[in-house]
Regions:
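Gly/Thr-rich phosphate-binding beta-strand-loop-beta motif of the actin/hexokinase/Hsp70
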Residues: 3-19, 130, 138-142, 155-158
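Glycine-rich phosphate-binding loop plus the immediately following alpha-helix
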Residues: 39-43, 158-234, 368, 372-377
Length: 417
């Protein structure tokens, strides 16, 4: 009997993934249908499911906060995505709409979904995943006898078939203020696992949040970090700019973002503390320059964040290999989109015999793919290794020959007589 699993990512970079008996047959980001960059709420994407199947076995949801915190349907009150699936007939209309057995919420394991996406498309039989993300799952914790919110920043997970994922390391951050702590053996109950993992908990920005801060400093929205990556070659090393990441000259046993220069604003973005340091303040006279990227301090900050952050991630990869004993590494989370860094790692990893697979859909749209595979592996326990992905084209194939285009032009009165 055929099994259909659809998974949606419902935040920014929202999208959908559809599996048929464990094979990916369709995946798309909402922005491709709505033409709104980074669009959230994959409603148009869900409607496209009907091009492939009339019913689903499971609708799986990926995000960083529980599904019951999503928008609700008028009158009935169930989450809007459950309502749409019900109205389209994709899930059983007779079941409890508030606790629908076909709707599975995986919002509590955001980084595992990034890992699942990368691992199950890598072709590796086993690997260690390195997730470097802006802010993953919201994790409430009691800190200094107060209830505080923390967020996943960087995570290392050992991955094996069929669905054996073991968290080895996690860095969680928050607004604070609170004292930083490193716990070598933190109980992994929240991860749904036995045993322990290493936990770093502090009130600094993570690797990606620091990159977002510099992106804002350069005049863009935090999510436009790719533009900062493009600006970096125009900058240079500038010793007047303080280190963005630091282990305080070896006085700490881990490196983290320097809060003197980067102030996190979880869950969205961070800011450069530009008033604190002379070199990165606004010039008194900008000579009429409105484009901030023309300023040397912006270009030099782009250079600093690119070179320092990629070194941080390389160190994290080496840590992952050491902790797991694996030579196969999969990389995902937002920083996986940094193609400059991805090529920079390669010769250094090759020297140590480390194989690297970088997930192309490392943004949150990839968590829909990861959620679909995760649920398939959980329910099937299939030990067959998924083949390594060959391309990014999942969906309808459009073939337009010159004759068709010519005919279309004439029938629409667009041709030049």
């Amino acid at each position: 009997m055929t099994q259909w699993i659809a998974a949606i990512a419902r935040g920014h970079n929202s999208g959908i993934c559809l599996l048929k008996d464990g094979e990916l047959v369709f995946s798309i980001e909402e922005e491709r249908l709505s033409r709104k960059k980074y669009d959230g709420g994959p409603l148009a994407s869900m409607i496209k499911i009907l091009d492939y199947t009339d019913t689903l076995d499971y609708l799986v949801v990926a995000h960083t906060q529980p599904l019951d915190q999503a928008g609700s349907n008028d009158f009935t009150g169930e989450p809007i995505y459950v309502a749409l699936a019900r109205k389209l007939g994709l899930i059983d209309r007779k079941e409890d709409i508030y606790k629908h057995p076909q709707v599975i919420d995986y919002s509590h394991i955001h980084h595992k979904l990034h890992s699942s996406c990368a691992f199950f498309r890598s072709g590796f039989e086993s690997a260690v995943s390195v997730i470097v993300d802006g802010a993953g799952t919201f994790i409430p914790m009691e800190i200094d006898r107060e209830q505080e919110m923390t967020w996943e920043l960087e995570t290392i997970i050992k991955c094996e078939y069929p669905d054996k994922f073991k968290t080895l390391y996690k860095h969680q951050g928050g607004r604070g203020p609170w004292g930083a702590v490193r716990i070598e053996k933190f109980v992994s109950d929240r991860e749904g696992e036995e045993g322990t993992h290493e936990l770093i908990l502090d009130d600094s920005a993570g690797i990606v949040k620091a990159y977002e801060a510099v992106t804002q400093y350069c005049g863009w929205a935090p999510i436009e970090a790719g533009k900062t990556m493009g600006l970096f070659p125009y900058g240079k090393e500038n010793n007047e700019i303080p280190d963005i990441y630091t282990n305080y000259d070896g006085r700490s046993d881990w490196a983290t973002t320097n809060r003197d220069i980067i102030v996190p604003t979880y869950p969205n973005g961070a800011v450069v503390n530009k008033g604190r340091f002379l070199e990165i303040r606004e010039p008194m006279d900008t000579n009429g320059i409105k484009d901030l990227t023309k300023l040397d301090n912006r270009r030099d900050m782009a250079y600093a964040i690119q070179t320092e952050s990629q070194s941080m991630v390389l160190d994290l990869i080496f840590k992952a290999v050491e902790m797991s004993g694996e030579k196969n590494v999969v990389l995902s989370g937002g920083y996986g989109l940094n193609c400059v860094a991805n090529y920079w790692y390669l010769p250094q990893l090759k020297e140590k015999g480390i194989n690297l697979f970088v997930e192309p859909v490392s943004n949150d749209a990839g968590t829909a793919i990861g959620a679909a595979y995760w649920h398939y592996q959980k329910t099937s326990k299939n030990m067959k290794v998924h083949p390594v992905m060959k391309d990014l084209y999942y969906g309808p194939k459009h073939e337009y020959d010159p004759e068709y285009i010519t005919c279309l032009l004439y029938t629409s009165d667009a041709a030049d007589e």
